[in-house]
Amino acid sequence: MTVFEAYITNLGKYAEGQLVGETLKFPATTEEVQSLLKNIGVDGVRYEEFFITAFDGDVMGLYDYLTEYENLDELNHLAHLISELDSDEIETLEAALNKGDHTSSVADIINLVHNLDCYSLHPGVTDDETLGRIYVEDMELLDVPDNVLPYFDFEAYGRDMRINEGGHFAPTGYLTRSGDFKEVYHLSLIHISEPTRPY
């Protein structure tokens, strides 16, 4: 299963005015990476460096945080982790990415994937009024008498709750933090198991 793709370009040839590159699908095997590098002329002798000119895939918001000089091993590790997520976890990841939580590097995003259980996502909740109604009518967090309910300002209540709990409206729903974030991964190949380290 392809999680995302990256267009890998030979940096030396690019500096010479030639655009030589190919698409690599992640997760990738060592053989796929080595074959791609050979095909684009990155041989470790004349041409040693490459860069990524484009990313593509279905995880909304992920590519906003990936740069042209990302580590292929880390990208592959991230792709393996994402491939193991179910659809609800993908939606939570997309909401956290939309919020900008832990997105300063691929290592941060790897840690974000490891900590998705620290978040609660309420799918389809995209405005303060809906949030206020859910908290008052469904979850009964506030006891509002029936005769006052038609006049109650659900939008103001929802806004206050969102501000107080540090919530965020994302395209996939309303996101809150519900646990302590633990840094599991550090930029080190020690943390990347052999099957996910292609380069």
Question: What function would you assign to each model-found segment?
Answer:
Residues N10-K13, A28, D56, A156, ...:
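Short, flexible loop/turn elements at secondary-structure junctions
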Residues E70, S83-E91, A95, T103-S105, ...:
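Extracellular/secreted glycoprotein ectodomains characterized by long, lumenal stretches
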Residues T9, A15-G21, I40, M139, ...:
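Short, glycine-biased loop/turn motifs at secondary-structure junctions and
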Residues M1-R46:
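N-terminal ordered "arm"
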Residues I163-L189:
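Long, highly charged low-complexity segments enriched in Glu/Asp and Lys/Arg with interspersed Ser/Thr
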Residues V33-D101:
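Structured domain cores in non-transmembrane regions
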